[in-house]
Amino acid sequence: MKYLPLYPILARYPFLRIASRVFSFNIEDELRKFLDTVEAAKRIVDKAIDGRVEYDRFTDESEFFCLGCEENCYDCQKRGTLEGCDLCMGCFENCSLYYPREAVERFYTNAKLSLLTYIASRMIVSAMEDWVRMRYAVNEASYYSRLLREDVEESGKEPIVRLVAIDLGAKLKGWKMHVSTFVRVSARIKDDKWRLVNRKLRNGWVETTKAEVLRGLEELLRMKLFEKVPVSEAVSEAVRELSRKAKRESEKFAMDLGEVDLNCLPPCMREILSELQRGMNIPHTARFAITSFLLNIGMTVDEIIALFKSAPDFDDEKTRYQVEHIAGERGKGAEYTSPSCDTMRTYSNCVADCRVSHPLIYYKKCKSKS
């Protein structure tokens, strides 16, 4: 049957662009016809607002048929690995693999429902505030990354990684990452081990591990899922309902800096706070920097935890532990000093040349003049 091997893949990974080749329908009509998909999308976004992931999806646990196919055809032998694939999907158009009609219909339906749910959820968050869309992007990228990890580590479906990589514009050679892809990913992760200067580079390819490739794809997917898409009237009621909840939630983490003089914050700290307020997923180095800095200038643990409630991956218990540790209320009892300007530059958290050696010096100088 035409495109049969792709149905289980699209049921698990509906964000793939190949869906537009496999399915052709009016999205508005289909969403109104399959109302369950809009409800499923609502649950996904609702949990994203709460910082949780919805695991109850329209998925399919079937194998990628080409990997074990016994058909003696060129496409299965050469294209089943997706090596060199350009996403034309022409090699799957004439699939002659036989499955009972009921099974084929199930594969098709699961893929279609998964795709409609994905589309509806993208539409809903596209009509909402940036912080909701960011939480959604972080949660969904993490969810699909977990599926991909399961497919690779438990089922040996490595061709699926190649398909996802091609779809996201990532260049891979085995488990090596092309330098252009590595730079795109590392610009957002901002972890010391993701700095190009710390990696082995040969003929344009960066030595990376399987885990790093999967982490890189997760980051690229997060960037894709954060983009806005056109919104259909079919999800308007869901948007109104969830927008009310998002408004209530955002009021909980409205930024209150207490006695802190916002005008005297150094540019680097203002930038980190701005990203937090927009619901951005800031790197660990930036989280440590802003936490230690705000503690150093007099903010309380509870006040700082309240700031982090807008983070897409906020976890109250984990955040409290980390903030209390930096404050010296756990561990050895020593309060940490915020990083110097040199350290901020090292981790790409510096955004301006303030002609000082430490963010605290900037703040104290400004306060003394006010």
Swiss-Prot record:
Q: Which family does it belong to?
A: Belongs to the eukaryotic-type primase large subunit family.
Cofactor(s) in the UniProt record: [4Fe-4S] cluster
Query: In the record's cofactor note, how is the cofactor described as bound?
Result: Binds 1 [4Fe-4S] cluster.
A GO cellular component annotation here is:
primosome complex
UniProt entry tagged with the keyword Metal-binding? yes
Q: What keywords tag this UniProt record? A: 4Fe-4S, DNA replication, Iron, Iron-sulfur, Metal-binding, Primosome
**Keyword Nucleotide-binding, does the record have it?**
no
Q: What is this protein called?
A: DNA primase large subunit PriL
Upper lineage ranks? Answer: Archaea, Methanobacteriati, Methanobacteriota, Archaeoglobi, Archaeoglobales
HAMAP family in the record: DNA_primase_lrg_arc
Q: How does this protein assemble? A: Heterodimer of a small subunit (PriS) and a large subunit (PriL).
**Free-text function comment from the UniProt entry:** Regulatory subunit of DNA primase, an RNA polymerase that catalyzes the synthesis of short RNA molecules used as primers for DNA polymerase during DNA replication. Stabilizes and modulates the activity of the small subunit, increasing the rate of DNA synthesis, and conferring RNA synthesis capability. The DNA polymerase activity may enable DNA primase to also catalyze primer extension after primer synthesis. May also play a role in DNA repair.
Q: Which gene encodes it?
A: priL
